[in-house]
Amino acid sequence: MTASPKQRVVVGLSGGVDSAVTAYLLRQQGHEVVGIFMKNWEDDDDGGYCPSGTDFVDAAAVADVIGIEIEHVNFAADYKERVFAEFLREYQAGRTPNPDVLCNAEIKFKAFLDHALRLGAEKIATGHYAGVRRNPASGRFELLKGADPAKDQSYFLHRLDQRQLSRTLFPLGALRKTEVRRLAEDIGLPNARKKDSTGICFIGERPFREFLNRYIGPAPGPIEDDRGRVLGQHSGLSFYTLGQRQGLGIGGLKEQGAQRGGGAHAPWFVARKELATNTLRVVQGHDHPWLLSRALEAQDARWICGAAPAPGRYAAKTRYRQQDASCTMASAGQAGFRLHFSEEQWAVTPGQSAVLYDGNVCLGGGVIAG
């Protein structure tokens, strides 16, 4: 979707190459472009792991080259209240949340959008690899997959609503990452070769367990296999997620003989977290039955068009960058939905998002309950 000529568009400038090219493209189209750098985490809270200062310098350098104004806005209080607090609650409940999904819905397309509108913006834009269009038949706005399958970010945007999409532009939706990099170099953007950010800003480059330990603390308990054999001790169920292979501390233990999809030298995987007994269940072998499921239930559903889709066959993702999985949805509502998959799905994880697609259109999704 493109903006009308000469609209006032506020762009979220992160300091990365994607948002930089986004701002450049909109400027080239003749729009009045203003950049906003969002500070979502206080430096005092992160021990220097979140390089917001460096990122702002990069964003300001980009704004200077493109010839636009940039404003530094602090959303840290909103982030802690709306995103981080929920992040901790989910981990304490034994689930594995995806804070990027909540951050998009609550900060980047709510707090940021509200701020941009106060500045007189008609649209906001970000460097996400996704698309938005208005369906001529229904008049509703639709969220589309990005053209680059390796970078498509519609999964993280599935909780956006009609108000948010109606005000949003995704200029990179039709481009591939290689094209964005090439364009950044061709026009001389100072961050053209900057490495893509990975992970969550408030965790940074530190080990995840080290970070989480500051807020939740250890709660040791037994590690048991699928037959109840005690293999070791875990440091707290919050520090593990389904399908996890590394960091279990039981790598030297091997089953005697092949069993359930794994031989004597097959690796161990986290299969269940039993909160009632504080027990971490592990199994040997990637294709152990405990790691496979044909159905899931999701709660706290959000539907982009405002109403649940009709029962039928769709595609779904239960994690980012997963290939679309064919499924059937028998019924759905605002409270939740249930999916049945054509093929077994691996390590479907409570707390992560189940996102539904009809071809190239993202319909919405919910939080996996089990």
From Swiss-Prot:
It catalyses: S-sulfanyl-L-cysteinyl-[protein] + uridine(34) in tRNA + AH2 + ATP = 2-thiouridine(34) in tRNA + L-cysteinyl-[protein] + A + AMP + diphosphate + H(+). Residues 151-153, 319-320 are annotated as: Interaction with tRNA. CDD domains: MnmA_TRMU-like (cd01998). The keyword Transferase applies. The record marks 128, 352 as: Interaction with tRNA. It is an enzyme of class 2 (transferase). GO terms for molecular function: ATP binding; tRNA binding; tRNA-uridine 2-sulfurtransferase activity. Disulfide bonds join 103-201. Its EC number is 2.8.1.13. Pfam families: tRNA_Me_trans, tRNA_Me_trans_C, tRNA_Me_trans_M. The active site is at residues 103, 201. Gene3D superfamilies: Adenine nucleotide alpha hydrolases-like domains (2.30.30.280), HUPs (3.40.50.620), Translation factors (2.40.30.10). Keywords: ATP-binding, Cytoplasm, Disulfide bond, Nucleotide-binding, RNA-binding, Transferase, tRNA processing, tRNA-binding. Its main location: cytoplasm. The keyword Membrane does not apply. ATP binds at residues 12-19, 38, 127. GO terms for biological process: tRNA wobble position uridine thiolation. Residues 98-100 are annotated as: Interaction with target base in tRNA. InterPro entries: MnmA-like, MnmA-like_C, MnmA-like_central, MnmA-like_central_sf, Rossmann-like_a/b/a_fold. It is found in: Cytoplasm. GO terms for cellular component: cytoplasm. Catalyzes the 2-thiolation of uridine at the wobble position (U34) of tRNA, leading to the formation of s(2)U34. Belongs to the MnmA/TRMU family. This is tRNA-specific 2-thiouridylase MnmA.
